[in-house]
Amino acid sequence: MSKGTLFDKVWDAHTVQILPSGQTQLFIGLHLIHEVTSPQAFAMLRERGLKVLYPDRTVATVDHIVPTENQARPFADYLAEEMMQALEKNAQDNGIRFCHIGSGDQGIVHVIAPEQGLTQPGMTIACGDSHTSTHGAFGAIAFGIGTSQVRDVLASQTLALAKLKVRKIEVNGTLAPGVYAKDVILHIIRKLGVKGGVGYAYEYAGTTFEAMSMEERMTVCNMAIEGGARCGYINPDQVTFDYLKGRDFAPTGENWDKAVEWWQSIRSDADAEYDDVIVFDAKDIEPTVTWGITPGQGIGVSEVIPIPDSLPESDRAIAKEAYEYMQLSPGAPIKGTKVDVCFIGSCTNGRISDLREAAKFAQGHHVSPGVKAFVVPGSERVKVQAEAEGLDKIFVEAGFEWREAGCSMCLAMNPDKLQGDQISASSSNRNFKGRQGSSTGRTLLMSPAMVVAAAINGQVSDVRELVS
């Protein structure tokens, strides 16, 4: 059993009581809601005559269903418009702050909360979205929850949860040029598997994570769920504090000093006990690309698609399914795989630092003929900042489309979708069958820089060669 970890300290600080079931009734400090998983939850409240208990601890935005080309209302998709109107009404009726389109604050829920300073160390955070683990980058314990749990948090500001075990994942060393946080997390998921973290919270530690910016740390924690972990976190440090200071909802004055003192106290103790510890070396990580239908089916860009005999027996059935669906051959190099669509964005890689890095490689080049490439900022604030820096012009001159903020092609809930059996090079987080809108569409996950390299060459390419 873990002891003295940040997870234990934050969990204990938010424990209301131990329930007869053995679960913990856990107080939730921040509840983030969006248009997809909240309408039914609000409907259940109305059926019971209940109101939102703590509207000041609840923040709403719209992200999943919003079009990124034409955002004029009403939306062309009547179901999307219906969800939008429902969220607007539910937020207004319950006194919830709503970051609506055009407010300057709208965007993907896991992008706007950190950039506004809503996400802070030591918090418990819940959202009806799988990638809520993103907020763990700040030293928060953040869970994705289902619609019935969204209802519970709205009504009681608590959740009934079983306490998780804690696994420390340590990565040490300096990442080579062309290797990014996205490659680190894809490498970890490849090694530990998509179910390896079931029942665990992951603590990411070591010199590699310590050297990362907050936005890079968010990329890592965002995909903790893809490795089976319920949440993932990084201990807060000066990088965290520097990022938060001065943001809209960050403490100020004496309250800031008190907050930092507490944030430092919740760091995992030097002698903390973990349920498991796994260590990786940064030098073993290269630009990584997924070849299959789970985020765990990834390989270095210099490798070949694994042959069945090289895989553990337990992985062979899903590998066979992946070969057939992806129309890729075992033993073939992943490098050179043709791509049709290139997407940069999502709650994994749609922040300003992601766009800066992508623009660096796009500048002076052009998207290959026949390839559709587009960039979707993670929030309105990211879009404004990118345009102030001229990044939009770099992308457009290179042949990329420049869009409005939203989830876009990460998932098939808005107009940005693959067609037929197109292959996409995507900076998003999931490569499941049909994830990007076509039942036969295929997704290759990679870093934004690698997406640019693929767009320029029309095929999976090694971004390190683009540098040279």
Curated annotation (Swiss-Prot):
E.C. number: 4.2.1.33
Reactions accelerated catalytically: (2R,3S)-3-isopropylmalate = (2S)-2-isopropylmalate
Gene Ontology MF annotations: 3-isopropylmalate dehydratase activity; 4 iron, 4 sulfur cluster binding; metal ion binding
Keywords annotated in UniProt: 4Fe-4S, Amino-acid biosynthesis, Branched-chain amino acid biosynthesis, Iron, Iron-sulfur, Leucine biosynthesis, Lyase, Metal-binding
BP GO annotations: L-leucine biosynthetic process
Pfam families membership: Aconitase (PF00330)
Binding sites annotated in the UniProt record for [4Fe-4S] cluster: 347, 407, 410
Pathway assigned in UniProt: Amino-acid biosynthesis; L-leucine biosynthesis; L-leucine from 3-methyl-2-oxobutanoate: step 2/4
CDD domains: IPMI
InterPro entries, alphabetized: 3-IsopropMal_deHydase_lsu, Acnase/IPM_dHydase_lsu_aba_1/3, Acoase/IPM_deHydtase_lsu_aba, Aconitase_4Fe-4S_BS, Aconitase_4Fe-4S_dom, IPM_dehydratase_rel_enz, IPMI_cat
Cofactor binding note: Binds 1 [4Fe-4S] cluster per subunit.
Cofactor needs: [4Fe-4S] cluster
Similarity comment: family membership: Belongs to the aconitase/IPM isomerase family. LeuC type 1 subfamily.
Role played: Catalyzes the isomerization between 2-isopropylmalate and 3-isopropylmalate, via the formation of 2-isopropylmaleate.
NCBIfam families assigned to the protein according to its UniProt record, in alphabetical order: leuC, PRK05478.1, PRK12466.1
Record note on quaternary structure: Heterodimer of LeuC and LeuD.
Protein name stated in the entry: 3-isopropylmalate dehydratase large subunit
Gene: leuC
